[in-house]
Amino acid sequence: MYDVKSRVATEFIDDKEILDTIAYAKQNKSNRELIEQLINRAKDCKGLTHREAAVLLECDQADLNQQMFHLAKQIKQKLYGNRIVMFAPLYLSNYCVNGCTYCPYHYKNKTICRKKLTQEEIRREVIALQDMGHKRLALEAGEDPVNNPLEYILESIETIYSIQHKNGAIRRVNVNIAATTVENYKKLKDAGIGTYILFQETYHKENYEKLHPTGPKHNYAYHTEAMDRAMEAGIDDVGIGVLFGLNMYRYDFVGLLMHAEHLEAAMGVGPHTISVPRIRPADDIDAQEFKDAISDEIFEKIVAVLRIAVPYTGMIISTRESQKTRERVLNLGVSQLSGGSRTSVGGYAEEEPEEENSAQFDLNDTRTLDQIVNWLLDGGFIPSFCTACYREGRTGDRFMQLVKSGQIANCCQPNALMTLKEYLEDYASDDTRRKGERAILEELKHIGSDKVRQITINRLELMKEGKRDFRF
Protein backbone atom coordinates (compact mmCIF):
# COMPACT_ATOMS: atom_id res chain seq x y z
CA MET A 1 0.00 0.00 0.00
CA TYR A 2 1.44 3.37 -1.07
CA ASP A 3 2.20 5.71 1.82
CA VAL A 4 4.38 8.73 1.07
CA LYS A 5 5.11 9.32 4.78
CA SER A 6 5.98 5.71 5.62
CA ARG A 7 9.58 4.95 6.59
CA VAL A 8 9.30 1.52 4.90
CA ALA A 9 10.92 1.42 1.46
CA THR A 10 8.29 -0.73 -0.25
CA GLU A 11 5.54 1.58 1.00
CA PHE A 12 6.94 4.96 -0.06
CA ILE A 13 8.29 3.37 -3.27
CA ASP A 14 5.22 1.27 -4.00
CA ASP A 15 5.45 -0.93 -7.10
CA LYS A 16 1.71 -0.81 -7.84
CA GLU A 17 1.64 2.98 -7.57
CA ILE A 18 4.52 3.25 -10.04
CA LEU A 19 2.90 0.87 -12.53
CA ASP A 20 -0.47 2.63 -12.17
CA THR A 21 1.27 5.97 -12.74
CA ILE A 22 2.96 4.72 -15.91
CA ALA A 23 -0.36 3.37 -17.20
CA TYR A 24 -2.11 6.67 -16.42
CA ALA A 25 0.63 8.60 -18.22
CA LYS A 26 0.37 6.43 -21.33
CA GLN A 27 -3.41 6.86 -21.38
CA ASN A 28 -2.97 10.64 -21.33
CA LYS A 29 0.07 11.08 -23.57
CA SER A 30 -2.08 12.81 -26.21
CA ASN A 31 -4.42 14.61 -23.80
CA ARG A 32 -3.60 18.18 -24.85
CA GLU A 33 -6.02 19.78 -22.41
CA LEU A 34 -4.47 17.99 -19.41
CA ILE A 35 -0.88 18.53 -20.57
CA GLU A 36 -1.46 22.24 -21.20
CA GLN A 37 -3.02 22.55 -17.73
CA LEU A 38 0.03 20.91 -16.15
CA ILE A 39 2.47 23.10 -18.08
CA ASN A 40 0.59 26.25 -17.09
CA ARG A 41 0.36 25.21 -13.44
CA ALA A 42 4.07 24.39 -13.34
CA LYS A 43 4.91 27.97 -14.29
CA ASP A 44 4.44 29.05 -10.66
CA CYS A 45 7.53 26.96 -9.73
CA LYS A 46 5.63 24.91 -7.16
CA GLY A 47 6.41 21.60 -8.87
CA LEU A 48 4.26 18.66 -9.93
CA THR A 49 3.38 15.28 -8.44
CA HIS A 50 5.02 12.12 -9.73
CA ARG A 51 1.83 11.23 -11.60
CA GLU A 52 1.57 14.63 -13.26
CA ALA A 53 5.25 14.61 -14.21
CA ALA A 54 4.87 11.15 -15.73
CA VAL A 55 2.22 12.53 -18.08
CA LEU A 56 4.62 15.24 -19.27
CA LEU A 57 7.37 12.67 -19.79
CA GLU A 58 5.02 10.55 -21.90
CA CYS A 59 3.64 13.46 -23.94
CA ASP A 60 3.79 12.73 -27.68
CA GLN A 61 2.89 16.23 -28.90
CA ALA A 62 5.97 17.90 -30.41
CA ASP A 63 4.83 21.47 -29.79
CA LEU A 64 4.00 20.74 -26.14
CA ASN A 65 7.37 19.07 -25.67
CA GLN A 66 9.03 22.26 -26.89
CA GLN A 67 6.93 24.24 -24.40
CA MET A 68 8.23 21.94 -21.65
CA PHE A 69 11.84 22.49 -22.67
CA HIS A 70 11.29 26.24 -22.67
CA LEU A 71 9.57 26.10 -19.28
CA ALA A 72 12.38 24.01 -17.75
CA LYS A 73 14.90 26.65 -18.81
CA GLN A 74 12.67 29.43 -17.45
CA ILE A 75 12.29 27.72 -14.07
CA LYS A 76 16.01 27.14 -13.73
CA GLN A 77 16.69 30.75 -14.69
CA LYS A 78 14.11 32.07 -12.23
CA LEU A 79 15.35 30.05 -9.25
CA TYR A 80 19.06 29.58 -9.96
CA GLY A 81 19.81 32.17 -12.65
CA ASN A 82 22.58 31.50 -15.15
CA ARG A 83 24.92 30.16 -12.47
CA ILE A 84 26.51 26.73 -12.85
CA VAL A 85 28.15 25.29 -9.73
CA MET A 86 31.48 23.55 -10.40
CA PHE A 87 32.86 20.49 -8.60
CA ALA A 88 35.16 17.51 -9.06
CA PRO A 89 34.99 13.91 -7.83
CA LEU A 90 37.85 12.47 -5.80
CA TYR A 91 37.98 8.67 -5.71
CA LEU A 92 39.67 7.49 -2.51
CA SER A 93 39.51 3.72 -2.99
CA ASN A 94 38.07 1.15 -5.38
CA TYR A 95 38.17 -1.76 -2.94
CA CYS A 96 34.61 -3.10 -2.70
CA VAL A 97 32.87 -6.18 -1.30
CA ASN A 98 29.72 -5.83 -3.41
CA GLY A 99 28.90 -7.72 -6.58
CA CYS A 100 27.17 -4.97 -8.59
CA THR A 101 26.92 -6.21 -12.18
CA TYR A 102 27.29 -2.75 -13.78
CA CYS A 103 30.30 -1.49 -11.81
CA PRO A 104 33.94 -2.54 -12.37
CA TYR A 105 34.61 -2.24 -8.62
CA HIS A 106 32.68 -5.50 -8.04
CA TYR A 107 34.69 -7.93 -5.95
CA LYS A 108 34.95 -10.59 -8.69
CA ASN A 109 36.79 -8.26 -11.07
CA LYS A 110 40.39 -9.49 -11.14
CA THR A 111 41.54 -7.22 -13.98
CA ILE A 112 41.02 -3.83 -12.35
CA CYS A 113 43.95 -2.33 -10.46
CA ARG A 114 42.89 -2.02 -6.82
CA LYS A 115 44.02 1.17 -5.14
CA LYS A 116 43.49 3.07 -1.92
CA LEU A 117 44.95 6.52 -1.36
CA THR A 118 47.09 7.17 1.70
CA GLN A 119 46.62 10.47 3.53
CA GLU A 120 49.81 11.76 1.90
CA GLU A 121 48.49 10.78 -1.53
CA ILE A 122 45.19 12.51 -0.70
CA ARG A 123 47.19 15.60 0.22
CA ARG A 124 48.89 15.59 -3.19
CA GLU A 125 45.58 15.04 -4.99
CA VAL A 126 43.94 17.91 -3.13
CA ILE A 127 46.82 20.26 -3.91
CA ALA A 128 46.46 19.34 -7.59
CA LEU A 129 42.70 19.98 -7.42
CA GLN A 130 43.24 23.30 -5.67
CA ASP A 131 45.80 24.28 -8.29
CA MET A 132 43.12 23.65 -10.94
CA GLY A 133 40.80 26.02 -9.07
CA HIS A 134 38.33 23.64 -7.45
CA LYS A 135 36.66 24.51 -4.13
CA ARG A 136 34.09 21.70 -3.92
CA LEU A 137 34.73 17.95 -4.01
CA ALA A 138 32.58 14.84 -4.10
CA LEU A 139 34.34 11.99 -2.28
CA GLU A 140 33.81 8.51 -3.71
CA ALA A 141 34.81 5.12 -2.28
CA GLY A 142 33.80 1.50 -2.68
CA GLU A 143 32.11 -0.34 0.18
CA ASP A 144 34.69 -2.35 2.09
CA PRO A 145 34.66 -2.34 5.91
CA VAL A 146 38.26 -3.59 6.06
CA ASN A 147 39.93 -1.37 3.46
CA ASN A 148 37.56 1.61 3.58
CA PRO A 149 36.15 1.80 7.12
CA LEU A 150 34.30 4.95 8.12
CA GLU A 151 37.33 6.02 10.14
CA TYR A 152 39.32 6.18 6.90
CA ILE A 153 36.65 8.38 5.28
CA LEU A 154 36.55 10.68 8.31
CA GLU A 155 40.34 10.99 8.40
CA SER A 156 40.35 11.75 4.67
CA ILE A 157 37.76 14.52 5.11
CA GLU A 158 39.87 16.07 7.88
CA THR A 159 42.95 15.91 5.65
CA ILE A 160 41.14 17.56 2.74
CA TYR A 161 39.81 20.45 4.81
CA SER A 162 43.24 21.04 6.38
CA ILE A 163 45.06 21.76 3.11
CA GLN A 164 45.46 25.32 1.87
CA HIS A 165 47.94 25.49 -0.99
CA LYS A 166 48.75 29.04 -2.14
CA ASN A 167 45.29 30.66 -2.42
CA GLY A 168 43.54 27.31 -2.66
CA ALA A 169 41.05 25.68 -0.32
CA ILE A 170 38.45 22.94 -0.49
CA ARG A 171 35.49 24.56 1.21
CA ARG A 172 32.83 21.88 0.79
CA VAL A 173 33.28 18.11 0.79
CA ASN A 174 30.26 16.12 -0.36
CA VAL A 175 30.36 12.39 0.30
CA ASN A 176 29.13 9.51 -1.85
CA ILE A 177 29.63 6.32 0.14
CA ALA A 178 27.52 3.25 0.86
CA ALA A 179 24.39 3.25 3.00
CA THR A 180 25.24 3.11 6.69
CA THR A 181 23.81 3.54 10.19
CA VAL A 182 22.35 6.59 11.93
CA GLU A 183 25.36 6.57 14.24
CA ASN A 184 27.78 6.67 11.32
CA TYR A 185 25.80 9.40 9.61
CA LYS A 186 26.14 11.46 12.80
CA LYS A 187 29.91 11.05 12.53
CA LEU A 188 29.83 12.26 8.92
CA LYS A 189 27.73 15.23 10.01
CA ASP A 190 30.24 16.07 12.75
CA ALA A 191 33.07 15.84 10.20
CA GLY A 192 31.52 18.79 8.36
CA ILE A 193 30.34 17.17 5.15
CA GLY A 194 28.19 19.13 2.75
CA THR A 195 25.77 16.83 0.94
CA TYR A 196 25.46 13.09 1.52
CA ILE A 197 24.93 11.49 -1.88
CA LEU A 198 23.65 7.98 -2.55
CA PHE A 199 22.28 6.78 -5.87
CA GLN A 200 19.44 4.31 -5.76
CA GLU A 201 20.64 2.85 -9.10
CA THR A 202 17.10 1.50 -9.73
CA TYR A 203 13.89 1.60 -7.71
CA HIS A 204 12.61 -1.69 -9.16
CA LYS A 205 13.10 -4.05 -6.21
CA GLU A 206 13.37 -7.30 -8.18
CA ASN A 207 15.79 -5.86 -10.73
CA TYR A 208 17.73 -4.09 -7.97
CA GLU A 209 18.36 -7.42 -6.24
CA LYS A 210 19.46 -9.03 -9.52
CA LEU A 211 21.85 -6.17 -10.27
CA HIS A 212 23.27 -6.42 -6.73
CA PRO A 213 23.41 -10.21 -6.25
CA THR A 214 25.90 -10.22 -3.37
CA GLY A 215 27.23 -7.95 -0.67
CA PRO A 216 25.54 -5.54 1.73
CA LYS A 217 24.18 -3.46 -1.16
CA HIS A 218 21.89 -6.40 -2.04
CA ASN A 219 19.57 -5.25 0.77
CA TYR A 220 17.04 -3.09 -1.10
CA ALA A 221 15.27 -1.77 1.98
CA TYR A 222 18.46 -0.80 3.83
CA HIS A 223 19.73 1.04 0.76
CA THR A 224 16.45 2.77 -0.13
CA GLU A 225 15.83 3.94 3.45
CA ALA A 226 19.37 5.35 3.81
CA MET A 227 18.38 8.97 3.26
CA ASP A 228 15.84 8.78 6.08
CA ARG A 229 18.61 7.61 8.41
CA ALA A 230 20.99 10.29 7.17
CA MET A 231 18.45 13.04 7.79
CA GLU A 232 17.49 11.53 11.13
CA ALA A 233 21.18 11.85 12.04
CA GLY A 234 21.10 15.57 11.28
CA ILE A 235 22.49 15.68 7.75
CA ASP A 236 20.46 18.50 6.22
CA ASP A 237 21.38 18.07 2.56
CA VAL A 238 21.05 14.77 0.71
CA GLY A 239 21.46 13.93 -2.96
CA ILE A 240 19.57 11.18 -4.79
CA GLY A 241 19.75 9.72 -8.29
CA VAL A 242 19.35 6.66 -10.47
CA LEU A 243 21.67 5.14 -13.06
CA PHE A 244 19.58 5.38 -16.19
CA GLY A 245 19.99 2.32 -18.39
CA LEU A 246 19.81 -0.29 -15.63
CA ASN A 247 16.03 -0.52 -15.73
CA MET A 248 12.98 0.83 -17.56
CA TYR A 249 13.48 4.59 -17.52
CA ARG A 250 9.79 5.35 -16.90
CA TYR A 251 9.80 3.23 -13.76
CA ASP A 252 12.93 4.84 -12.32
CA PHE A 253 11.79 8.33 -13.27
CA VAL A 254 8.60 7.86 -11.26
CA GLY A 255 10.48 6.19 -8.40
CA LEU A 256 12.92 9.09 -8.23
CA LEU A 257 10.10 11.60 -7.88
CA MET A 258 8.32 9.44 -5.30
CA HIS A 259 11.55 9.36 -3.29
CA ALA A 260 11.78 13.16 -3.45
CA GLU A 261 8.14 13.47 -2.37
CA HIS A 262 8.74 11.04 0.48
CA LEU A 263 11.71 12.98 1.85
CA GLU A 264 9.73 16.20 1.83
CA ALA A 265 6.66 14.59 3.41
CA ALA A 266 8.40 12.41 6.00
CA MET A 267 11.62 14.31 6.74
CA GLY A 268 10.50 17.88 6.11
CA VAL A 269 12.76 18.70 3.17
CA GLY A 270 13.29 17.24 -0.28
CA PRO A 271 16.61 16.31 -1.90
CA HIS A 272 19.26 19.02 -2.16
CA THR A 273 20.41 17.51 -5.45
CA ILE A 274 19.25 15.02 -8.06
CA SER A 275 21.82 13.36 -10.32
CA VAL A 276 21.02 11.86 -13.71
CA PRO A 277 23.92 9.60 -14.74
CA ARG A 278 23.63 7.12 -17.62
CA ILE A 279 25.46 3.81 -17.70
CA ARG A 280 28.90 4.03 -19.34
CA PRO A 281 31.54 1.49 -20.44
CA ALA A 282 34.22 0.65 -17.87
CA ASP A 283 36.98 -1.90 -17.23
CA ASP A 284 35.02 -5.17 -17.56
CA ILE A 285 31.60 -3.59 -18.11
CA ASP A 286 30.03 -3.43 -21.57
CA ALA A 287 27.28 -0.81 -21.46
CA GLN A 288 25.70 -2.31 -24.58
CA GLU A 289 24.73 -5.38 -22.56
CA PHE A 290 22.17 -3.26 -20.71
CA LYS A 291 19.09 -3.20 -22.92
CA ASP A 292 17.34 -0.33 -21.13
CA ALA A 293 19.84 2.32 -22.27
CA ILE A 294 18.14 5.58 -23.20
CA SER A 295 18.59 7.87 -26.18
CA ASP A 296 19.80 11.46 -25.97
CA GLU A 297 16.27 12.64 -26.76
CA ILE A 298 14.72 10.73 -23.86
CA PHE A 299 17.56 11.77 -21.56
CA GLU A 300 17.01 15.44 -22.36
CA LYS A 301 13.28 15.11 -21.74
CA ILE A 302 13.93 13.43 -18.38
CA VAL A 303 16.14 16.36 -17.34
CA ALA A 304 13.55 18.92 -18.44
CA VAL A 305 10.61 17.26 -16.69
CA LEU A 306 12.63 16.72 -13.50
CA ARG A 307 13.40 20.44 -13.42
CA ILE A 308 9.70 21.22 -13.87
CA ALA A 309 8.56 18.66 -11.27
CA VAL A 310 11.21 19.41 -8.61
CA PRO A 311 12.12 23.04 -9.29
CA TYR A 312 13.95 23.64 -6.01
CA THR A 313 16.58 20.92 -6.38
CA GLY A 314 20.09 21.24 -7.74
CA MET A 315 20.51 19.05 -10.81
CA ILE A 316 23.89 17.45 -11.50
CA ILE A 317 25.46 16.13 -14.68
CA SER A 318 28.92 14.59 -14.79
CA THR A 319 31.65 13.91 -17.33
CA ARG A 320 29.85 10.66 -18.18
CA GLU A 321 28.12 12.83 -20.79
CA SER A 322 29.65 14.39 -23.89
CA GLN A 323 30.18 18.11 -24.40
CA LYS A 324 27.24 18.17 -26.82
CA THR A 325 24.85 16.49 -24.38
CA ARG A 326 26.02 18.64 -21.48
CA GLU A 327 25.44 21.74 -23.57
CA ARG A 328 21.87 20.64 -24.32
CA VAL A 329 20.90 19.83 -20.75
CA LEU A 330 22.46 23.01 -19.36
CA ASN A 331 19.61 24.73 -21.16
CA LEU A 332 17.06 22.29 -19.71
CA GLY A 333 17.66 22.77 -16.01
CA VAL A 334 21.05 21.38 -14.95
CA SER A 335 22.69 23.59 -12.29
CA GLN A 336 25.84 21.68 -11.27
CA LEU A 337 28.65 20.39 -13.46
CA SER A 338 31.87 18.48 -12.88
CA GLY A 339 34.97 19.67 -14.68
CA GLY A 340 38.48 18.37 -15.30
CA SER A 341 37.38 15.12 -13.65
CA ARG A 342 39.25 11.88 -13.05
CA THR A 343 37.28 8.75 -12.22
CA SER A 344 40.36 6.73 -11.33
CA VAL A 345 41.62 6.45 -7.76
CA GLY A 346 43.77 9.55 -7.69
CA GLY A 347 44.78 10.73 -11.15
CA TYR A 348 44.95 14.47 -10.51
CA ALA A 349 48.48 14.79 -9.14
CA GLU A 350 49.86 12.34 -11.72
CA GLU A 351 48.09 10.85 -14.71
CA GLU A 352 47.38 7.18 -14.15
CA PRO A 353 49.31 4.78 -16.42
CA GLU A 354 46.99 2.95 -18.82
CA GLU A 355 47.99 -0.44 -17.42
CA GLU A 356 46.90 0.68 -13.93
CA ASN A 357 43.33 1.51 -14.92
CA SER A 358 41.33 1.96 -11.69
CA ALA A 359 38.47 4.05 -13.08
CA GLN A 360 34.82 3.47 -12.26
CA PHE A 361 33.72 4.52 -15.76
CA ASP A 362 35.13 6.01 -18.95
CA LEU A 363 34.91 9.77 -19.37
CA ASN A 364 32.97 11.31 -22.23
CA ASP A 365 34.10 14.88 -21.56
CA THR A 366 37.87 15.07 -21.04
CA ARG A 367 38.31 18.85 -21.16
CA THR A 368 40.27 20.69 -18.48
CA LEU A 369 38.50 22.80 -15.88
CA ASP A 370 39.72 25.97 -17.61
CA GLN A 371 38.35 24.80 -20.95
CA ILE A 372 34.97 24.10 -19.36
CA VAL A 373 34.90 27.46 -17.56
CA ASN A 374 35.75 29.16 -20.86
CA TRP A 375 33.02 27.21 -22.65
CA LEU A 376 30.43 28.08 -19.99
CA LEU A 377 31.28 31.77 -20.28
CA ASP A 378 30.85 31.54 -24.06
CA GLY A 379 27.39 30.07 -23.43
CA GLY A 380 26.30 32.97 -21.23
CA PHE A 381 26.65 31.05 -17.96
CA ILE A 382 28.47 32.10 -14.80
CA PRO A 383 30.69 29.30 -13.46
CA SER A 384 30.35 29.39 -9.68
CA PHE A 385 32.76 27.96 -7.13
CA CYS A 386 30.56 29.11 -4.27
CA THR A 387 30.17 27.10 -1.05
CA ALA A 388 28.70 29.91 1.06
CA CYS A 389 25.29 28.40 1.85
CA TYR A 390 26.87 25.40 3.54
CA ARG A 391 29.32 27.57 5.48
CA GLU A 392 26.67 30.10 6.50
CA GLY A 393 24.22 27.45 7.68
CA ARG A 394 21.83 27.88 4.77
CA THR A 395 21.15 24.15 4.53
CA GLY A 396 18.16 21.85 4.61
CA ASP A 397 14.80 23.58 4.98
CA ARG A 398 16.40 27.03 5.35
CA PHE A 399 18.03 26.65 1.93
CA MET A 400 14.86 25.27 0.35
CA GLN A 401 12.75 28.16 1.63
CA LEU A 402 15.16 30.63 0.04
CA VAL A 403 15.08 28.76 -3.28
CA LYS A 404 11.31 28.32 -3.35
CA SER A 405 10.78 32.01 -2.57
CA GLY A 406 13.24 33.06 -5.27
CA GLN A 407 15.38 34.88 -2.69
CA ILE A 408 18.45 32.65 -3.02
CA ALA A 409 19.74 34.88 -5.84
CA ASN A 410 20.34 37.66 -3.28
CA CYS A 411 23.19 35.52 -1.95
CA CYS A 412 24.10 33.31 -4.88
CA GLN A 413 24.54 35.94 -7.55
CA PRO A 414 27.20 38.06 -5.79
CA ASN A 415 28.84 34.94 -4.32
CA ALA A 416 29.12 33.38 -7.77
CA LEU A 417 30.78 36.51 -9.13
CA MET A 418 33.25 36.70 -6.25
CA THR A 419 34.25 33.04 -6.51
CA LEU A 420 34.57 33.36 -10.29
CA LYS A 421 36.84 36.36 -9.68
CA GLU A 422 38.99 34.19 -7.38
CA TYR A 423 39.30 31.63 -10.16
CA LEU A 424 40.18 34.27 -12.75
CA GLU A 425 42.85 35.85 -10.54
CA ASP A 426 44.52 32.61 -9.47
CA TYR A 427 44.02 29.90 -12.10
CA ALA A 428 42.51 31.05 -15.40
CA SER A 429 44.18 31.23 -18.79
CA ASP A 430 44.44 34.69 -20.34
CA ASP A 431 41.51 34.06 -22.68
CA THR A 432 39.28 32.75 -19.89
CA ARG A 433 40.27 35.68 -17.68
CA ARG A 434 39.27 38.22 -20.32
CA LYS A 435 35.90 36.55 -20.90
CA GLY A 436 35.28 36.20 -17.17
CA GLU A 437 36.04 39.83 -16.39
CA ARG A 438 33.58 40.94 -19.09
CA ALA A 439 30.94 38.59 -17.70
CA ILE A 440 31.39 39.90 -14.15
CA LEU A 441 30.99 43.52 -15.28
CA GLU A 442 27.79 42.61 -17.10
CA GLU A 443 26.36 40.52 -14.26
CA LEU A 444 26.99 43.23 -11.67
CA LYS A 445 24.26 45.24 -13.40
CA HIS A 446 21.73 42.54 -12.55
CA ILE A 447 22.28 42.53 -8.77
CA GLY A 448 18.98 43.92 -7.51
CA SER A 449 20.17 45.58 -4.31
CA ASP A 450 22.30 48.72 -4.71
CA LYS A 451 23.90 48.01 -1.34
CA VAL A 452 24.81 44.41 -2.19
CA ARG A 453 26.10 45.50 -5.60
CA GLN A 454 28.42 48.10 -4.08
CA ILE A 455 29.72 45.70 -1.43
CA THR A 456 30.39 43.17 -4.18
CA ILE A 457 32.26 45.76 -6.28
CA ASN A 458 34.37 46.73 -3.25
CA ARG A 459 35.23 43.10 -2.54
CA LEU A 460 36.13 42.45 -6.18
CA GLU A 461 38.61 45.33 -5.92
CA LEU A 462 40.09 43.85 -2.75
CA MET A 463 40.60 40.56 -4.59
CA LYS A 464 42.92 42.32 -7.01
CA GLU A 465 45.09 43.04 -3.96
CA GLY A 466 45.19 39.35 -3.00
CA LYS A 467 42.29 39.17 -0.53
CA ARG A 468 40.15 36.02 -0.78
CA ASP A 469 37.11 34.17 0.58
CA PHE A 470 34.41 36.82 0.74
CA ARG A 471 30.80 35.70 0.94
CA PHE A 472 27.26 36.79 1.67
Task: Please describe what each predicted stretch is.
Residues M1-Q37, R41, E327-S335, S341-F472:
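Radical SAM enzyme core and accessory elements
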Residues E36, N40, D44-I84:
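An N-cap/entry alpha-helix motif that binds or orients negatively charged groups
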Residues Y80-G81, V85-E121:
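Canonical Radical SAM [4Fe-4S] cluster-binding loop centered on the CxxxCxxC motif
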Residues A88, V126, L154-Y161, Y185, ...:
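Generic structural signal for well-ordered alpha-helices
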Residues Y107-R124, A128-A230, D237-L246, G268-S275, ...:
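Core AdoMet radical
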Residues A141, T195, Q200, A221-I285, ...:
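Conserved C-terminal portion of the radical SAM core fold
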Residues L211-K217, Q288-D292, S358:
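Short glycine-enriched, charge-decorated loop/helix-capping segments at active-site entrances
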